[in-house]
């Protein structure tokens, strides 16, 4: 096996949208970093069956609507 090809695997804290948090191991960030979620399994419409509005990060939803909004579906 090749040495030093795998990313660093360390502990981080994940904060859910309701403020609850848990510690897990990840390759994201650095040891001890905190990952704040914008949407999680408790609030995502795909898992809750709700009709909450999606957060438009980087204008992706707006860009899609501008491009395909005139299809009239």
UniProtKB/Swiss-Prot annotation:
InterPro entries: Ribosomal_bL28/bL31-like_sf, Ribosomal_bL31, Ribosomal_bL31_A, Ribosomal_bL31_sf. GO terms for molecular function: rRNA binding; structural constituent of ribosome. One of its GO terms (biological process) is translation. Gene3D superfamilies: Ribosomal protein L31. Keywords: Ribonucleoprotein, Ribosomal protein, RNA-binding, rRNA-binding. It comes from the Bacteria. GO terms for cellular component: ribonucleoprotein complex; ribosome. HAMAP family: Ribosomal_bL31_1 (MF_00501). Part of the 50S ribosomal subunit. Belongs to the bacterial ribosomal protein bL31 family. Type A subfamily. Binds the 23S rRNA. NCBIfam families: L31, PRK00528.1. This is Large ribosomal subunit protein bL31.
């Amino acid at each position: 096996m090749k040495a030093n090809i795998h990313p660093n695997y360390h502990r981080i804290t994940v904060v859910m949208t309701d403020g609850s948090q848990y510690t897990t191991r990840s390759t994201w960030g650095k040891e001890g970093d905190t990952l704040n979620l914008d949407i999680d399994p408790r609030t995502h419409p795909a898992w809750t069956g709700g009709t909450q509005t999606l957060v438009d990060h980087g204008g992706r939803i707006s860009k899609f609507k501008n491009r395909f909004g005139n299809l009239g579906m």
